[in-house]
Amino acid sequence: MKVMKFGGTSVGTPQRMKEVTKLVTKSGEPVFVVLSAMSGTTNSLVEISDYLYKKNPDGANEVINRLEQKYAKHVDELYSKEETKSATREFLRGEFDFLRSFTKELFTSFEEKSIVAQGEIISTNMVVNYMKEQGINAVLLNALDFMRTDKNAEPDPMYIREKLKPILAENEGAQVYLTQGFICRNAYGEVDNLQRGGSDYTASLIGEAISAEEIQIWTDIDGMHNNDPRVVDKTDPVHQLHFEEAAELAYFGAKILHPTCIQPAKYAGIPVRLLNTMDPDAEGTTISNKTEYGKIKAIAAKDNITAIKIKSSRMLLATGFLRKVFEIFESYQTSIDMICTSEVGVSMSIDNSAHLGEIVDELKKYGTVTVDTNMCIVCVVGDLDWSNIGFETLALDALKDIPVRMVSYGGSNYNISFLIREEDKKRALQNLSNTIFYKK
């Protein structure tokens, strides 16, 4: 069985819902479908929550009424049978009455998660009703019955697997199994959500749990590209990526995929395909354990980086010095992206400057501290094992006219990173594309 995940834009209108239905039933084989809320709905639900936090029930009710009117129009556009329209209207009436009930109660973060969850609950019910109207044997599985996080707010794969198995057995023979893509319960049974990776993560976890043949992530983009099309003048789709290459690109700025979401698929050895609902026949990108030896796949960039350098000839070589430095960053929950050391100094980069002042003050105990802001990490991704000669020279040649603050290689065989000024980002990405992909 394949798992197919569709984001908010893919189910953003009644017409898109109809087209998604055609896509998932095209093969005639059973599929497990994961849906997000209709585009714009989650923002409205967050707006409702904001009003309630501010003790403004009138503002919340205004947004609820506006959202209800929007969905009333969707019902008329989506369904052809009066019976289905009536049943869906009744369902929506209950959902919006539920939202209004929060305007009369004490409001906390727990209630906010329940409110935000309604977006996916509404979209999945609307789509499953449409499928049934079309004569499709579709079953709606409530994600709150099997998706759970543990006490560390991390997904609980064993629980998901154990809960899903009997649920699927009870509904054996269905053509489409449909569920929500963001919501879950926490270890205490409360409504919660998968904060990192959202519905992509859910699709990957479900794929692992049911030993899926393939996990498909459908968006409005033709998979991964070899550079950022918003910055450079030419890009091409990347048709094949190793799991590690995809993780590097996701971490360093490729917005199409969250770095955590492919981990379950990687561990289970299940291919992930990135496909485009607007162009379903496009090849897209396949992510798997396959390596294309010695090939550079793509370039990505990460903005809003801060570089920190500690210079201390007295302390650097002292036992435990680096441990003390790392403990400072850990105490402020600030991750280090890049690190380089020498006999008299250590340079690091971070992407979270929320506690920069406190971190710098503590680092000054150990030496002279220099901070550079408005930096950018540019990374070249591919099969870059040290035995593959020449990729370093190629990248450095492309950056020969651009000041490079740091270079990082060796922590991964799939990435070489350069820290540059943000103002040089466009030129760096363009030069790397010209040199590596288009031989200009």
Sequence positions of predicted segments:
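Structured core elements
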Residues: 3, 10, 32-33, 177-179, ...
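Glycine-rich beta-alpha junction loops
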Residues: 37-39, 221-223, 276-281, 291, ...
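Flexible loop/turn segments at secondary-structure boundaries
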Residues: 11, 41-42, 148, 185-187, ...
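A conserved active-site cap/scaffold subdomain adjacent to cofactor or substrate pockets
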Residues: 242-288, 292-314
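Nucleotide/pyrophosphate-binding catalytic subdomain
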Residues: 1-257, 262, 421
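A conserved regulatory-domain signal marking ACT and ACT-like small-molecule sensing domains
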Residues: 283-440
